């Protein structure tokens, strides 16, 4: 048994040696053949990019919520409408700035134009609605020192030697003149006062009328006075009126009387008196018409006052 096994081993070893030789010969022949290119290695697949959540995107009205979708084409920008094109609203030009005159008071200018100043009185005056506030402690007073006074109010209970007051004069202007040109002379009468110093001035329209206002200080009887003076050229119907208001107080009382004088200056108004609207006249031959099925109505009877029994 042992011999047989050894013989088998020799035979198996010979067979193995022969097989290896065949393999080597075959491999040698195969190595002489041209090498084929290796197959392409597939590229690694990248992980999909992380898309931010939709709730963090700002959605436009009518737009797409998908940030990767094609964006809509932008709306064409409308070209500006040229000035003066049909359908455009024309902006009225600003009025030219008013240049104050350097000489000649307002009254002097009107007289040079041949305009007559006719003083007006408050009784029966209806051409203009003039508002003059009356502060506490102030009363209407007669003042012979104010020529052609329309109304004068003053604080007779003040502590100053000088009585704080407001003077209003109204003139009807008879004659032809240019109100816009005339009002440029509104500063001159104040600027001629002794030691005049301007603190504020304006020629802006007042309640729609040409107007001038100038404020400042001047000297009178060894006192320094503080004053505000306004001129208004108002139109009522075919007539023109010069309305002038001056509010004056002692400089030492300017702070104490400030609320009162400010109330007068800021509350002053000049408005053209509006004529009452007239009811349209009935058509000739027309009669009052009643409700359907009723006889024509009669005009309403007047209010009757009951007579007490005798």
From Swiss-Prot:
The gene is mtc28. One of its GO terms (cellular component) is extracellular region. Residues 1-32 form the signal peptide. It comes from the Bacteria. Pfam families: Lpp-LpqN (PF10738). Residues 278-310 are annotated as: Disordered. Keywords: Signal. The lineage of its organism: Bacteria, Bacillati, Actinomycetota, Actinomycetes, Mycobacteriales. This is Proline-rich 28 kDa antigen. To M.leprae ML0031. Transmembrane segments: none annotated. InterPro entries: Lipoprotein_LpqN/LpqT-like (IPR019674).
